[in-house]
A protein has these predicted regions:
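Structured, basic alpha/beta domains of bacterial-type, RNA-associated proteins
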Residues: 2-25, 31-82, 87, 91, ...
Length: 164
């Protein structure tokens, strides 16, 4: 069987600024991400991050990939997210940001704009894509809600059984 090779998406232009796209999924939530050079503003469905996510763990999940790559204050993030609940949406956004960052660093390293980390043989320096993958931001969490079965109360729970 032939191996499928995924090509990195080229940047899109929003106005005069270059933007990098990423898509993330978690449970039934789907997030579409645009990373634009800026000063660190994050807007989700045209609302600020602090207004959209009230839980600190959800905010940290969204900001995690940016802080790992040390790009928190250098990129603006525009997000459109649909479906799922709040935590599922946070996971989808996190994966989408990581994928967009991977595309951004992958294209920059391939073009020679930013030298590939670890290219000069420095021990302990890891490329961004590998760093994101090792941290788990690029991995799709495939856990979904299990369907309800007939003859049962839920997916696993059975109706009460009486022997006599």
């Amino acid at each position: 069987m032939a191996e499928q090779v995924r090509k990195e998406r080229p940047p899109v232009f929003l106005g005069k600024k270059r933007a990098y796209q990423g898509t993330g999924r978690r449970k039934t939530a789907v997030a579409r991400i645009f990373l634009i050079e800026g000063n660190g503003q994050i807007s989700i469905n045209e609302r600020p991050l602090d207004d959209y996510f009230t839980e600190i763990k959800d905010r940290n999940a969204v900001v995690g990939p940016l802080e790992l790559c040390e790009m928190r204050n250098r990129l603006d993030v525009r997000v459109t997210v649909q479906g799922g609940g709040i935590t599922g949406q946070a996971g989808a956004i996190s994966q989408g940001i990581a994928r967009a960052l991977k595309g951004m660093f992958g294209l920059a390293e391939a073009a020679g704009q930013a030298p590939a980390e670890g290219a000069d043989g420095e021990p302990g320096v890891v490329p961004m894509a590998k760093r994101l993958r090792d941290s788990g931001y690029l991995t799709r969490d495939g856990r979904m809600k299990e369907r309800k079965k007939y003859g049962r109360k839920g997916a696993r729970k059975a109706f009460q059984f009486s022997k006599r």
